Every structure is written in C-alpha cells, then in structure tokens.
C-alpha cells in the first residue's frame, strides 16, 4: 500500500453547491491556480455537463493547470462523460469522476432503477469513460448507506472495467469514525481486485465528523485519497476541511505514517481567497485558518508560549502561511513590486492587461488609505466589481448626500452590457439609497436575504468587505465588494450578486 496520501480538492464543484457560493469562471480559475500553488494532487474543477458555464470553467482550468490533475464530475451516462472528456481534452493530467447512487433509498426513490440496472449502468459508464481518458474515478453515491453485498458487486465490477480510483462517500454525513473506517476496510478485504484501485473517502459534516471520519477511513480503512474543500465549504454543514485533514496528517505523522505533497505555507492564502470570493467569512475559532487559531488570551498560556512555543502550540503559524500583519506596499510602490506581491500571495492574473488594471485599482486605494495590508490586496483582486468578460453589470462611481434630519440621497453610475447608466434614489440610509438607485434601472425583483460587513484589517481606515446575498426564483447567490467606503463596497457587492444571478439564470436556460 502506498504511503502517499492524495489530496483531492472539490471546492470548485462540491464546495460551490453551498447556497450562495456560486463562482464565475474567472473566480474559479483564480482559485484553481492557488490550489496548484498549494500543490493539491487533484482539482475537481466542476461538473462539465451541468451547464455551459461549468463546461467553460472546467475547460479553462484544464488549459491553465500544469501540475495538478484536473477532474470533472459526470453522471453515469455517455452524454455527461463525453462532455467531461471534451472539457478536459487540453489537460496535462485529466480525470473523469463518474457516479451513480447505490443505496436502496436512492435507487428506489430517486433513480427508480433496480439494483441490476444500476450495476449495468455503473459498468457501462466506466467502460465508456476508460476509452476517453486513462484516469477514472467511480463513486457509489450514498455509498455508506448502501447494502454491503450489493456495493461489493458494483465496486468489483467497475474496477474490472478500468476504474483507477474508488471513492466511497458518506453523502449525508451519517457515519461515525470507527464504523466508517471499518466499512472501508471490509470493502477492501472482500473485493478480490481491490488492490487494482486507489481507495478514497468523501465525508460530509452534518454531524460535525467529516474530518474525523475521513481520518478513520485513512487509518482504519486504508484509503489513500481524501476528498475535501478549502474552509470545509459545501452544502448543508459542509465537507471535510482540507486544511484540517492536511495538518492532522502532517502534525501526527507519528500516527498516520503518510507523506503529503501539499505546500502548507499556502493554506492561509487559499483560505482567504475562497472566503473573499464566496463571501463566506471564516469563523475566528476555525482550526488552522481562523483568526484565533494561534491566539492566546490566557495569561498562563501567554507566559508558556513566550518561554517555549511548543508548550501550547502543536504547529507553527508560519508553516500554514500566517504572517504578521504588516504594510507591504504604499502609494510610491511600482508596478513590479505590486506584481511580485501578487505572486507571493498566490494570485496569478490571466494577462498583463489584468495586472495593469489591478495595479491602477491598487494606486487608487493607496491614495485613500495610508497602510496597505496583504488582506487589502487580496480583497482588491477578489472584490473587483468592474464588469469582467461575460458580466452584465459593472461599478463606475457613486456619490451620496446625507445630513442629520434628512433622508439620504445616492447617485450611482454603473454599466449595463457595457453602457453607462445613472441611477439616483433616496433611502433609509446611504446604503439603502445606493442599492435603490441601482434597482431603479435594473428592476431585478430579487430579495436580499443577507447583508454583512467585515473589516479587512484592524484600523479605522480599513477597507470594509461587504457580502450581499440575493434570492430569486429559488436561486441564491452571494456578491462581495470591498472599499474603504462602506457605501461603495455595498454597491459593488450588490452588482456582483446581480451578475451571479444573471449567470445562474443563463445556466438554467441552457439546461432547458
């Protein structure tokens, strides 16, 4: 058995299924590049057959990524598999991940198929996929709640058809660590050809045990791949957290005895990027990447850490990418210094034109804010609200008037399909007025279900990072905007959310 643990990141696919976490093609590409910098083994870039937008994102990532394997999810049918292969055709290393449900509940209620029909479809899908790419992963959806005898038949059959990775998901987060570990081990022991494939675990966090279950699948079950997401992002209670699984295996190498290819010094940068892109703020006490992960308030603890760090710290903050909050650039900094700082932070823009545009935004920020932190630069790049390729709305400018005893008034200039429009409105506050000014032209009809503000750094002149969550016709999206002026940040976030609603509507229309 291999002593290398493969890290399979599904932030861009399963993570994006978290309500409001939808990402644009460019946002996915930026995160994929950071995952490659992190040296993730496999990047699940999306579900190519689900929409034209997902196909384009998988295709762009397949073309850009050189070191990591790029994977697309696919249902167990020829159309989905062919679409995935087409999106992956330019990848240096391509994987198709095909799946079909195998639990009695799913087969009867969702698929309306007999076990024999499911078995045949699983075999056919792997056989077809293997003719298109060499690296095939198969997942029995709701595998943990499947009948073991039937599951063994399915997995033995798909390995015989050429599946190179067998992933056994705890789709609804029902498992308990010891039971899940034994479940994986029993499958491997009962299936005659189990040694022909890498065994993988995919655990959800509904009972708060996704990481524990995954570790049990590795230690007890002998799995050598873990599927996970940055910050544990995912639908319902989320997925197994990449940063936690990686640091558990690295910190307790004495127990697990496994090697990792991950460059852990890029973990915090990846966490920040995903948080700022999706608008999902990382809780302060989140293991490894939370703001308090290496903080000590107790006097006894502080005294111990000052004398010897290992009295209360089992890993070093700098090993996962935490650095002191320091000024990195100022208004006199040049373009080359800015470009180098982007590279140090794991940000790779697509073209020199994009670098130039980002540098101009940086200079504008530096004129307004005396101290520029890493967080400011990441927010500046992630929270750009100017209309990108394929985006309908873009922020241009905003002015407001507010005096005590009078209703605030805001005027917003923004673009719609490349043409400038001017909106103006009064409101209950400056933010309300600015968003009503936008709506006076857009008429989206969307309901705002969340509005939150987060200070990016600790000073009074900090940029505010605003998250706006909109809901319309069952679609939920988050928009993020950043600016030292909270009203401007709010307008940017609102336009970002409108762009994502538009993108989701186009995906639904494309699916028919």
UniProtKB/Swiss-Prot annotation:
Entry keyword set: Amino-acid biosynthesis, Branched-chain amino acid biosynthesis, Cytoplasm, Leucine biosynthesis, Manganese, Metal-binding, Transferase
Keyword Metal-binding: yes
One Pfam family hit: LeuA_dimer
Domain of life: Bacteria
PROSITE patterns recorded: AIPM_HOMOCIT_SYNTH_1, AIPM_HOMOCIT_SYNTH_2, PYR_CT
Region feature (Regulatory domain): 394-512
GO molecular function, one term: acetyl-CoA C-acetyltransferase activity
CDD domains xrefs: DRE_TIM_IPMS (cd07940)
Annotated Gene Ontology cellular component terms: cytosol
Reaction(s) the record says it catalyses: 3-methyl-2-oxobutanoate + acetyl-CoA + H2O = (2S)-2-isopropylmalate + CoA + H(+)
Domain Pyruvate carboxyltransferase: from-to ranges: 5-268
Pathway: Amino-acid biosynthesis; L-leucine biosynthesis; L-leucine from 3-methyl-2-oxobutanoate: step 1/4
EC number: 2.3.3.13
InterPro entries documented for this protein: 2-IPM_HCS-like, 2-isopropylmalate_synth_dimer, AIPM/Hcit_synth_CS, Aldolase_TIM, LeuA/HCS_post-cat, LeuA_allosteric_dom_sf, LeuA_bact_synth, PYR_CT
Binding-site residues for Mn(2+), renumbered to this chain: 14, 202, 204, 239
Location(s), subcellular: Cytoplasm
Names of required cofactors: Mn(2+)
Primary subcellular site in the record, as a coarse category: cytoplasm
GO BP annotation list: L-leucine biosynthetic process
Family to which the UniProt record says this protein belongs: Belongs to the alpha-IPM synthase/homocitrate synthase family. LeuA type 1 subfamily.
Protein task: Catalyzes the condensation of the acetyl group of acetyl-CoA with 3-methyl-2-oxobutanoate (2-ketoisovalerate) to form 3-carboxy-3-hydroxy-4-methylpentanoate (2-isopropylmalate).
Subunit structure: Homodimer.
Protein name: 2-isopropylmalate synthase
Gene name per UniProt: leuA
